[in-house]
A protein has these predicted regions:
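Membrane-embedded alpha-helical bundles of multi-pass enzymes
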Residues: 1-192
Length: 192
């Protein structure tokens, strides 16, 4: 897959993942987004996996944090022009965390169920770092997908938001890894 196609696919998957979060609250989209991101990054070089992670992050944060642009329109004459560059810059900067996560996953060269676990751990560590480094920015955590669902949300009391995110990403990627065990199902796995 060419780098341009990889980038656009990953960007679209990141944008799709936003619909799992409130106010849309469609966590059923997470296996599609993360399963496909796993397929885009497994077996790739660190550079290509990092690029896919960055593009996924840009799509995820650009659409997930677009509400920040509203603050620039309080005084639109003076600050309105800053809305698009500010949100785009924030998305591009925050996307460095998923980029690092996917590069670390690619570095592990792990596939199968172990690969799914490493993938989920890399993603969760990147969310934790994003939420704690410098002043922290714990917005748009994957665990927020369960905000409108009582039963899954209650597990956050035991494992926290980052632990719930880890379990969510792991359960999102596992079906694809299990389908990939049998080579003839690879094409089908791409559509899951």
């Amino acid at each position: 897959m060419s780098g341009i196609i990889l980038t656009f696919c990953a960007f679209g998957l990141g944008a799709l993942a936003v619909f799992a979060l409130p106010p849309f609250s469609m966590p059923v989209l997470l296996p599609v987004a993360f399963g496909a991101l796993y397929l885009l990054t497994v077996g790739e070089s660190r550079m290509r996996a990092g690029l896919a992670g960055w593009a996924f992050g840009v799509g995820f944060f650009l659409f997930g944090l677009s509400w920040i642009a509203e603050s620039f329109f309080v005084d639109a004459e003076r600050f309105g022009w800053m809305a698009v560059p500010a949100v785009a810059g924030l998305a591009a900067g925050l996307a460095l965390f998923p980029a690092a996560a996917m590069a670390a996953f690619a570095w592990s060269r792990t596939k199968g169920v172990s690969g799914a676990l490493i993938f989920a751990v890399c993603w969760s560590v990147s969310e934790w770092l994003r939420g704690t480094m410098l002043t922290g920015f714990p917005w748009n955590l994957i665990a927020y997908a369960w905000a409108d669902y009582d039963v899954p949300r209650q597990t956050a009391a035991w494992v926290g938001s980052y632990g719930l995110g880890l379990v969510t990403v792991l359960l999102s990627v596992l079906p694809v890894t299990l389908l990939m065990r049998n080579r003839r199902h690879n094409t089908f796995a791409a559509f899951v």
